[in-house]
Swiss-Prot record:
One of its GO terms (cellular component) is cytoplasm. Specifically methylates the cytosine at position 1962 (m5C1962) of 23S rRNA. It comes from Escherichia coli O139:H28 (strain E24377A / ETEC). Belongs to the methyltransferase superfamily. RlmI family. Pfam families: Methyltrans_SAM, PUA_3. One of its GO terms (molecular function) is rRNA (cytosine) methyltransferase activity. It catalyses: cytidine(1962) in 23S rRNA + S-adenosyl-L-methionine = 5-methylcytidine(1962) in 23S rRNA + S-adenosyl-L-homocysteine + H(+). Keywords: Cytoplasm, Methyltransferase, RNA-binding, rRNA processing, S-adenosyl-L-methionine, Transferase. This is Ribosomal RNA large subunit methyltransferase I. The keyword Methyltransferase applies. It is found in: Cytoplasm. SUPFAM superfamilies: PUA domain-like, S-adenosyl-L-methionine-dependent methyltransferases.
């Protein structure tokens, strides 16, 4: 008999709506013993089968659902089916947009909770973020090797969230050849260098692909400030859009060096690109105090909030940084501002920008809204999958 997680009475509603998480407060008891990440059956208080998922005793998310089909086993064939289903959508996108790199698996939204896989050319970069994903590592890798024999697999599960599930951080080559120090990829006519081994996340922010392209419509003959620039994707796109100057700001000299290489790789005018190593908050105040002005500002900060207790402080941070940006914009200037914090809703983020404009003494018009690129889908039963939101704002 399989190990069963029994829900408290009335706590089955989210599963009946096919939400993939079971929180610790919904659990009445365990019937049998399960190891970290092991597959268990989830039943209601009367013993009715609801789902099959991965057990995580150390996490507030006590179980993550693999399947709502009682006949489906969690094995190599299961992962092969999920991967093939996800690949169909990415094949269409890759052909339509001319992509050689994309998110192959977007966790829960692709039916594989706790699993992120990005493809960069012939390299698959893997992040296993939950106990269940780690428990199924061998089955997943076997499925990947069968479906993608041409690809090397590199593990970037060096993510702090694993500690919440009682797991160590892991990183390194799984199969195939080691990725080069900087791997060139293509995106909307740009060539970009990706550091798979040491870069942020899996090496590059594929989720901002469409936003980088959209930037081009606003920048012709404009002076652009690119905040939290990382390796310069927005900067290269701005130069391709015909900007007169782009100033990229980041605290990482390594990232700025790659940004410079990306400008050179695309044979763009390096004299129009400036790279500044500094704290963005500090530099924006310096620019304000000396009367600097820009026509377009890209504000793409890292995640400010990891849990609900940090949300209030994050709101203040987003408000302050957007207020400073609005103060630096010329009349009619464009602010492209983003939040990748899942707990920050689009409505709340829009309110924060409106409040920032009031504090800056300026009016703003919301003229365009952004979200993560289409290779980062959001399944309807898991709205938490929509984490990236952004706005184009015209400053009056």
């Amino acid at each position: 008999m399989s190990v069963r997680l029994v829900l408290a009475k009335g706590r089955e509603k989210s599963l009946l709506r096919r939400h993939p998480w079971v929180f610790s407060g919904a659990v009445a008891r365990m019937e049998g013993k399960a190891s970290l990440g092991e597959t268990i059956d989830i039943v209601d208080h009367q013993g009715k089968w609801l789902a099959r998922g991965a057990y995580s005793p150390a996490s507030q998310i006590r179980a993550r659902v693999w399947t709502f089909d009682p006949s489906e086993s969690i094995d190599i064939a299961f992962f092969s089916r999920r991967l093939q289903q996800a690949q169909k959508w990415r094949d269409w996108l890759a052909q339509k947009d001319g992509l050689d790199s994309y998110r192959l698996i977007a966790g829960e939204s692709d039916g594989l909770p706790g699993i992120t896989i990005d493809r960069f050319g012939n390299f698959l970069v893997l992040q296993l973020l939950s106990a269940g994903a780690e428990y199924q590592r061998a089955a997943l890798i076997s499925a990947l090797q069968t479906l993608y024999p041409e690809c090397a697999i590199y593990d970037r599960s060096d993510v702090a969230v694993r500690k919440k599930e009682g797991m160590e951080l892991t990183q390194g080559l799984v199969t195939g050849e080691l990725p080069p120090a900087l791997l060139p990829i293509e995106e909307h006519g740009m060539k970009l260098l990706v550091d798979i081994q040491h870069g942020h996340k899996t090496g590059y922010y594929l989720d901002q692909r469409d936003s980088r392209l959209a930037t081009r419509r606003y920048v012709e003959n404009k002076r652009v400030l690119n905040c939290f620039s990382y390796t310069g994707g927005f900067a290269v796109s701005a130069l391709m859009g015909g900007c007169s100057q782009v100033v990229s700001v980041d605290t990482s000299q390594e990232a700025l060096d790659i940004a410079r290489q990306n400008v050179e790789l695309n044979k763009l005018d390096l004299s129009k690109a400036e790279f500044v190593r500094d704290d963005v908050f500090k530099l924006l105040r310096t620019y304000r105090d000396r009367g600097e002005k820009f026509d377009v500002i890209v504000m793409d900060p890292p995640k400010f909030v990891e849990n609900k207790s940090q949300l209030m402080g994050a709101c203040r941070g987003y408000k302050d940084i957007n207020m400073l940006a609005i103060q630096l914009l010329n009349e009619g200037g464009i602010l492209l501002t983003f939040s990748c914090s899942g707990l920050m809703t689009s409505d709340l983020f829009q309110k924060i920008i409106a409040d920032a404009a009031i504090d800056a003494g300026r009016d703003v018009q919301f003229i365009e809204q952004f979200r993560q690129a289409a290779d980062h889908p959001v399944i309807a039963t898991y709205p938490e999958g929509l984490y990236l939101k952004g706005f184009a704002c015209r400053v009056m």
